[in-house]
Amino acid sequence: MSQKNFVELRNVTKRFGSNTVIDNINLTIPQGQMVTLLGPSGCGKTTILRLVAGLEKPSEGQIFIDGEDVTHRSIQQRDICMVFQSYALFPHMSLGENVGYGLKMLGVSRSEVKQRVKEALAMVDLEGFEDRYVDQISGGQQQRVALARALILKPKVLLFDEPLSNLDANLRRSMRDKIRELQKQFNITSLYVTHDQSEAFAVSDTVLVMNKGHIMQIGSPQDLYRQPASRFMASFMGDANLFPANFSEEYVDIYGYRLPRAAHFPVQGSGTVGVRPEAITLSNHGEESQRCVIRHVAYMGPQYEVTVEWHGQEILLQVNATRLQPDIGEHYYLEIHPYGMFVLADAA
């Protein structure tokens, strides 16, 4: 059974003066799904978040939430909560007062506020922190307080504006897992903004990649990585080696190196094939067409990041550090594994 589209942007454009920041965007978020807007700085992703929140008004188009046109409604009229990058906590209030502030403004009784604050803090693993203050807890704990403050209101839509960007790597990992866990537990329709690909992949049902105010591609994290639609997508969704290729019914020919043709590849003509670094391995044996030379080696802990020269082109690949220790100038034979290959539709 298909899910109801809970948030919808129809032909939305946003201009600031003569600058078009969002250009005729159409976007839907199914009920209970986490959709992430991913893209480089200035691509328009935060503007979309602010449009959904009601902090900005579109120059053209309509915004719907739960089937209602909210284009001209304020944020207070949209039943939305936002988790900010800066946490936006009140330093003069206790954590319990911060979390319960929204309920207090809604006129909820003191006893109910107290009980719901206790439950909300427990959800984010901060049980018993009601009487502490912002300056007594870490950045990661502050972000969890901000999340509890949003969840306690049981909003129709939850918005995340780069919520993990101020945290270190270990805290980011644990916090993103907590966000995803709670979003799924409470089935909250959510829109998440980040410029971090791994973060987007970890929290999302669907990722929408933007560039210069346009949607470049929409899909699951797996689809975007395995089947990018353009050169921009291939490079933005991780490292990619791009090769000229010739296609036939039986094989793909890259610099004379023939590989079995995947079912979804063209059966004739030429084009561009992309290969992810993890789909290329090095061997001591092979055909002359596979021969390459090591140009650069970087030790990355469990693996080496290796650059080889192959038919005059520099290729990036990853080598398991326990299996091979390549040195600059050494010759090997590269092997391309079909699971990491894709064909690009654009030639630009």
Swiss-Prot record:
<protein>
    <recommendedName>
        <fullName>Fe(3+) ions import ATP-binding protein FbpC</fullName>
        <ecNumber>7.2.2.7</ecNumber>
    </recommendedName>
</protein>
<dbReference type="GO" id="GO:0015408">
    <property type="term" value="F:ABC-type ferric iron transporter activity"/>
</dbReference>
<keyword id="KW-0410">Iron transport</keyword>
<comment type="similarity">
    <text>Belongs to the ABC transporter superfamily. Fe(3+) ion importer (TC 3.A.1.10) family.</text>
</comment>
<dbReference type="InterPro" id="IPR050093">
    <property type="entry name" value="ABC_SmlMolc_Importer"/>
</dbReference>
<dbReference type="InterPro" id="IPR003593">
    <property type="entry name" value="AAA+_ATPase"/>
</dbReference>
<keyword id="KW-0997">Cell inner membrane</keyword>
<keyword id="KW-1278">Translocase</keyword>
<keyword id="KW-0408">Iron</keyword>
<dbReference type="InterPro" id="IPR008995">
    <property type="entry name" value="Mo/tungstate-bd_C_term_dom"/>
</dbReference>
<dbReference type="Pfam" id="PF08402">
    <property type="entry name" value="TOBE_2"/>
</dbReference>
<dbReference type="Pfam" id="PF00005">
    <property type="entry name" value="ABC_tran"/>
</dbReference>
<keyword id="KW-0067">ATP-binding</keyword>
<feature type="domain" description="ABC transporter">
    <location>
        <begin position="7"/>
        <end position="237"/>
    </location>
</feature>
<dbReference type="InterPro" id="IPR027417">
    <property type="entry name" value="P-loop_NTPase"/>
</dbReference>
<dbReference type="InterPro" id="IPR013611">
    <property type="entry name" value="Transp-assoc_OB_typ2"/>
</dbReference>
<keyword id="KW-0547">Nucleotide-binding</keyword>
<dbReference type="GO" id="GO:0043190">
    <property type="term" value="C:ATP-binding cassette (ABC) transporter complex"/>
</dbReference>
<keyword id="KW-1003">Cell membrane</keyword>
<comment type="function">
    <text>Part of the ABC transporter complex FbpABC involved in Fe(3+) ions import. Responsible for energy coupling to the transport system.</text>
</comment>
<dbReference type="GO" id="GO:0005524">
    <property type="term" value="F:ATP binding"/>
</dbReference>
<dbReference type="GO" id="GO:0016887">
    <property type="term" value="F:ATP hydrolysis activity"/>
</dbReference>
<dbReference type="InterPro" id="IPR003439">
    <property type="entry name" value="ABC_transporter-like_ATP-bd"/>
</dbReference>
<dbReference type="InterPro" id="IPR017871">
    <property type="entry name" value="ABC_transporter-like_CS"/>
</dbReference>
<comment type="subunit">
    <text>The complex is composed of two ATP-binding proteins (FbpC), two transmembrane proteins (FbpB) and a solute-binding protein (FbpA).</text>
</comment>
<feature type="binding site">
    <location>
        <begin position="39"/>
        <end position="46"/>
    </location>
    <ligand>
        <name>ATP</name>
    </ligand>
</feature>
<keyword id="KW-0406">Ion transport</keyword>
<keyword id="KW-0813">Transport</keyword>
<keyword id="KW-0472">Membrane</keyword>
